[in-house]
Amino acid sequence: WIPACTGMTEFDGMPDLKLSMFAIAALFRIHFICYLPKGRLKTVRLVLAKFLLKSNALSLSDDIAMQAHTLVWFRRNLRIRDNAALSAAVKRGLPVAGVWVAQGSSEIPNPRQDWFHYQAAAALHRSLAARGVALYVVNRVEELPALATRLNVQTVIADEAYTSSEIGQDNRIWRILDEQGVAFERVNDRAIFAKAEIMGSHGAPYTDFPHYKEAWLALFRQRFGGQDAGGGCVEIFQTASVEMPSFPAWNGQQDMVSAQRGGEDEADKQWRQFEENIGFYPIMKDFPARKGTSRLSAYLSAGCISPRVLATEAAGQGADAWLDNLIRRDFYQQLAYHRARIEPESAAVSATFSDDLTECWRQGKTGFPLIDAAMRSLKSSGWLHPALRSLTAEFLCGILHQPSEHGIVWFAEQQTDFDPALNVGNWQTAARNACRHSIDIIQTARRLDPDGTFVRRHIPELAHLPVNLVHTPWLASSEIDAHGYPLPVVAP
């Protein structure tokens, strides 16, 4: 083994060593990993593979496994079209493999989102397999370095992380991979513009949305100019791969109910349906009972569809009102990365926590029909209309005077489209708004649900009430039965 350490690249003059794979692996680990510089490690691996092949100690499948690979770590970019990480891997010219970590990085359990991401990853597995690319599934992120060693990976490429927990995880994985001589690269695949592409005049991140939006639009026009983002499917058709592993069966909660199904094709179908009526979005977006929004948030959260593609296609149709949602999404992503200081809630908003009040809010039993209908809808389907998200958040902070942190956690547990950066950003905005102005909950309810359709859909106890009482059932005469629907927990 000494010639290999000193630079020898052929084993022609060496005796035919009859070592088992286990013995060779042990010898390799003990004598090479401990003493070789990182730059030598991959050379020795390839030299070892050559020797094993010449001595017939390695099968054809093992030979493929010993080839150098580029590994794409799919996280919140579970798609092929306009996938920057996959494109970067293909450009390297080495065989490409993928990996998906079944246990996500979120510290808050969310079985409904886990199920959605599982469906999306299964669809990605099929799409990659059709192109000759293997997608491996590991249970925990700590298993990724071992897979990289097994596949003789030169570089791991992943979508850029934004939150502190994800960045911390990336740093831990990077250190392990670095010790193995494996590079770890990250590319912008989650937002339209990378986290530091749009900065203020003094190099500081924008903390107010109007100024950020102005800068975002200027850069968008400069870079895309209304043209397509170039988001076609990656041209990758590999004729050989390490293997084609099967996709594991779902081992999570069995009774999951989701309003949508995960996957790139499902995302594209949802976008095309909305695209047909995108011109009506400014008129219909504030009515929860109508299908006036895109319902793409879960697909964007999982990365089943590219925000770059959506932005260029929406801009090409003059859909500025809807494009505003994608800009705000970028805004909250970069805020999460920069950990920009957002105005804290006032002492009046963050009053003493009441578990009873917060639990009534969670379960849709506050006695305010539209709030309760919204919270019941969220719990049953995992999705909530955007207008109702801000209303229920402002209700918790401004009317019940409860800390936003409890709402942040509850939404994180319930939403199929949960995104940590957007969740925190939206809640902090709602808490700030609740501090600055009072909410007329009744007038707002009548504006958003004028005929009570949404309330009746989710609160059957009130389905029999007329329009003038459906949002104020406490005003009904004693002869009208509310079927156990509670009185308001605070004075209307």
Each model region followed by its residue ranges:
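A cross-taxon signal for low-complexity, glycine/charged-rich
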Residues: 7-8, 13, 29-32, 36, ...
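Glycine/tryptophan-enriched, flexible segments
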Residues: 50, 56, 182, 203-352, ...
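Trp/Phe/Arg-rich N-terminal binding region typifying the photolyase-homology
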Residues: 51, 56, 60, 64-224, ...
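C-terminal substrate/ligand-recognition segments
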Residues: 333, 362-402
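Active/binding-pocket-proximal capping segment
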Residues: 343, 349-352, 390-435
